[in-house]
Amino acid sequence: MTQDYKLQVEAIKCGTVIDHIPAQIGFKLLSLFKLTATDQRITIGLNLPSKRSGRKDLIKIENTFLTEQQANQLAMYAPDATVNRIDNYEVVKKLTLSLPERIDAVLTCPNSNCISHNEPVDSSFTVKAQRGEISLKCKYCEKEFDHLAVLHAD
């Protein structure tokens, strides 16, 4: 028995595909990591069916390639995501994500008293992973937060 599968999001010729993003996280990743700061076409799939997790988000950015450092920063919120480099409609490289040691100039400290809110400094967090839990420690106020608290601290 054969089954026909139809792409729900158009293929790209050249660029980056971030796949297997947890559902409801795709838009936040676009915003946090400034993935829309480009003139290139971006295709977003939200709540797509996934055999792995039931539902997923997907981001395709044409003619743009993420560095390994940029891809690893995504791992904090989409640890099972895959980041694929596409060339001539083919996957030419798959990046394996791992948590970075630091994340700079991306996130906002949830502590409203932190100097990073009032001084001209870039935010900076040390990433800590223990027993499957991810936390972030602010360089300035030295408070530690669950990574999801920082995700929603805009």
Swiss-Prot record:
<dbReference type="InterPro" id="IPR020542">
    <property type="entry name" value="Asp_carbamoyltrfase_reg_C"/>
</dbReference>
<dbReference type="InterPro" id="IPR020545">
    <property type="entry name" value="Asp_carbamoyltransf_reg_N"/>
</dbReference>
<protein>
    <recommendedName>
        <fullName>Aspartate carbamoyltransferase regulatory chain</fullName>
    </recommendedName>
</protein>
<dbReference type="Pfam" id="PF01948">
    <property type="entry name" value="PyrI"/>
</dbReference>
<dbReference type="GO" id="GO:0046872">
    <property type="term" value="F:metal ion binding"/>
</dbReference>
<dbReference type="InterPro" id="IPR002801">
    <property type="entry name" value="Asp_carbamoylTrfase_reg"/>
</dbReference>
<keyword id="KW-0862">Zinc</keyword>
<keyword id="KW-0665">Pyrimidine biosynthesis</keyword>
<dbReference type="GO" id="GO:0006221">
    <property type="term" value="P:pyrimidine nucleotide biosynthetic process"/>
</dbReference>
<dbReference type="GO" id="GO:0009347">
    <property type="term" value="C:aspartate carbamoyltransferase complex"/>
</dbReference>
<keyword id="KW-0479">Metal-binding</keyword>
<feature type="binding site">
    <location>
        <position position="114"/>
    </location>
    <ligand>
        <name>Zn(2+)</name>
    </ligand>
</feature>
<comment type="similarity">
    <text>Belongs to the PyrI family.</text>
</comment>
<dbReference type="InterPro" id="IPR036792">
    <property type="entry name" value="Asp_carbatrfase_reg_C_sf"/>
</dbReference>
<dbReference type="InterPro" id="IPR036793">
    <property type="entry name" value="Asp_carbatrfase_reg_N_sf"/>
</dbReference>
<dbReference type="GO" id="GO:0006207">
    <property type="term" value="P:'de novo' pyrimidine nucleobase biosynthetic process"/>
</dbReference>
<comment type="function">
    <text>Involved in allosteric regulation of aspartate carbamoyltransferase.</text>
</comment>
<feature type="binding site">
    <location>
        <position position="109"/>
    </location>
    <ligand>
        <name>Zn(2+)</name>
    </ligand>
</feature>
<feature type="binding site">
    <location>
        <position position="141"/>
    </location>
    <ligand>
        <name>Zn(2+)</name>
    </ligand>
</feature>
<feature type="binding site">
    <location>
        <position position="138"/>
    </location>
    <ligand>
        <name>Zn(2+)</name>
    </ligand>
</feature>
<dbReference type="Pfam" id="PF02748">
    <property type="entry name" value="PyrI_C"/>
</dbReference>
<comment type="subunit">
    <text>Contains catalytic and regulatory chains.</text>
</comment>
